[in-house]
């Protein structure tokens, strides 16, 4: 089980450790873990560590200090290390001194981009105390980095993303790897942080009610068929998707149901021949009414919004079965919300931002 902690919980857990350790020791401990992760990422992406080029984009907080110390440790492994200081007057002084003493080079202020030939960028702009989008100088740097395809390793969180909600209100760094310290934060579950690696820095963390499943938890809960099971005890999924214009949607949606280890998949709609040619184990019918016994429906992908499509949506939602509503079915449902207003059975809507807006439920957040 993954445990997630607020920024305040992390800071409270850090306080006794900071008091017990020499000044700067906890930062160097975190930076050592960061440097190890960056070295592994260099091997994975650039084929090695020594001789590779790393550039830290450094903000004014402790995250910038972490990035500078990590770059310092990487210098000792033969990495050419550069730093772009976004706020030179507020850069972590001891970390910057160590970086320069190790042969690291400062390439200018925030109006200067990362050097040509950089193999990896360390995002040390803002950490768990930061809020809001990237400021213009940092935004320009990370926009250029994104266009160049240079990989980014974020320190704690990708800068510009809200640590509590994962919301992105403007320019933000896009990281292929995020290295975080002490404990996971909500942002690591709510936003795209790339791969997330947790570095143990010796914090004693409290109990938390912010929990998430990992692969082991899912595997432990995943039902496995026994000797007395059949297709009905394992679940029969009915798929209402596709049309003459979009038969591929039916193929993809039905294939997803097959891959999800449903006990049986039934398809109902005009793309029956195409579906069965790709998935011969699927039982196909021309309409939902003729589909046979179903225990849950998915309706909408490529369905269209004509009368036949509306009939399929109505059929699914008028049942007492669980229904997933997606794509064209969401468009129709936004026009006819009464179809779900009195539903007691489980109903899952999966809108993207544009589909969400059609429901007129308020501003679109990153998690809709």
Task: For each feature predicted by the language model, list its residue ranges.
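N-terminal small/polar loop signature for handling phosphorylated ligands or for N-terminal nucleophile
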Residues: 69-147, 274-293
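Internal gly/pro-rich beta-alpha loop/helix module
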Residues: 118-120, 125-210
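Small-residue (G/A/S/T)-rich helix-start motifs and N-terminal tracts that mark the onset
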Residues: 1-85, 175-177, 185-327, 331-368
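Short beta-alpha junction loops
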Residues: 87-89, 157-159, 329
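Polar low-complexity intrinsically disordered regions enriched in Ser/Thr and small residues
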Residues: 106-107, 111-113, 169, 305-307, ...
């Amino acid at each position: 089980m993954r445990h997630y902690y607020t920024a305040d919980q992390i800071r409270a857990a850090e306080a006794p450790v900071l008091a017990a350790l020499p000044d700067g020791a906890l930062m160097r401990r975190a930076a050592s873990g960061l440097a190890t992760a960056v070295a592994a990422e260099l091997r994975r992406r650039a084929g090695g560590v020594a001789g590779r080029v790393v550039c830290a984009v450094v903000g004014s907080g402790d995250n910038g200090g972490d990035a500078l110390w990590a770059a310092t440790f990487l210098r000792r492994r033969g990495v050419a290390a550069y730093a772009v200081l976004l706020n030179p007057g507020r850069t972590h002084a001891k970390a910057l001194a160590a970086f320069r003493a190790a042969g690291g080079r400062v390439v200018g202020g925030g109006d200067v981009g990362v050097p040509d030939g950089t193999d990896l960028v360390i995002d040390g702009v803002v950490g768990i105390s930061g809020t809001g989008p990237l400021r213009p100088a940092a935004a320009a740097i990370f926009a250029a980095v994104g266009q160049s395809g240079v990989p980014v390793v974020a320190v704690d969180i990708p800068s510009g993303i809200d640590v509590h909600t994962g919301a992105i209100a403007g320019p933000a760094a896009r990281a292929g790897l995020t290295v975080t310290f002490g404990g996971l934060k909500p942002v690591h579950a709510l936003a795209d942080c790339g791969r997330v690696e947790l570095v143990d820095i010796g914090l004693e963390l409290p109990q938390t009610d912010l929990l998430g499943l990992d692969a082991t938890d899912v595997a432990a809960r995943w039902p496995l068929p026994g000797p007395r099971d059949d297709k009905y005890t394992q679940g029969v999924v009915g798929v209402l998707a596709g049309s003459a214009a979009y038969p591929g949607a039916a193929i993809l949606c039905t294939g997803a149901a097959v891959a999800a280890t449903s006990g049986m998949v039934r398809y109902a709609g005009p793309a029956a021949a195409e579906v069965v040619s790709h998935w011969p184990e699927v039982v196909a019918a021309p309409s939902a009414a003729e589909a046979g016994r179903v225990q849950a429906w998915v309706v909408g992908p490529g369905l269209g919004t004509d009368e036949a499509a509306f009939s399929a949506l109505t059929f699914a939602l008028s049942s007492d079965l669980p229904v997933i509503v997606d794509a064209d079915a969401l468009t129709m449902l936004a026009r006819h919300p009464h179809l779900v207003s009195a539903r007691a059975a489980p109903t899952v809507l999966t809108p993207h931002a544009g589909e969400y807006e059609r429901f007129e439920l308020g501003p679109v957040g990153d998690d809709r």
